[in-house]
Amino acid sequence: MAEQRNIFLIGPMGAGKSTIGRHLAQMLHLDFLDSDAEIEKKTGADIAWVFDVEGEEGFRNREQSMIDELTQKHGIVLATGGGALIRPENRIHLSARGIVVYLKTSVNKQLARTLKDKRRPLLQTDDPRTVLEALAEKRNEFYDEVADYTMETDEQSAKVVASQIIALLDF
């Protein structure tokens, strides 16, 4: 039996990685994993708590270890955290071990999708728009560098984007 390919979803918070990833995995009969959810399972604490206690550096160390572990699996759809590509090691593992799809979205859509989400430590500020714009400035080049394919998610449902990814990848 041929080895199953992996699909790795990257992009900023609020791009729809987890939601689209679940649909994609279900449609392709693959396992869905979310690196943030896996970190929460392993630590027994939510991401906000890890950020509070260990700082962003501590969280990024955990994330790097988790992405290394998860990308070694076969036949998965993996949703990564928005900042995962900051680390060069993560970019290397994702590129080498699967097909990378960048889910691209606007800051306006990110704001609409994340406005009431208290589980996003980087957005717990008086000016989340400025934070999202700064993150985009810093991270978009990494998404572009690693992506095998780019999909716009602003004006489409998660199911439609998942179907488009399947058609694009010819699964």
UniProtKB/Swiss-Prot annotation:
UniProt KW Cell division keyword: no
Cellular component, GO annotation: cytosol
Enzyme Commission designation: 2.7.1.71
UniProt main location, coarse: cytoplasm
Binding, ATP: 14-19, 120, 156
Cofactor(s) required for function per UniProt: Mg(2+)
Residues that bind Mg(2+): 18
Keyword Kinase belongs to the record: yes
Subunit structure: Monomer.
PANTHER family: SHIKIMATE KINASE (PTHR21087), SHIKIMATE KINASE 1, CHLOROPLASTIC (PTHR21087:SF16)
The family this protein is said to belong to: Belongs to the shikimate kinase family.
Name by which UniProt lists this protein: Shikimate kinase
Organism: Psychromonas ingrahamii (strain DSM 17664 / CCUG 51855 / 37)
Gene: aroK
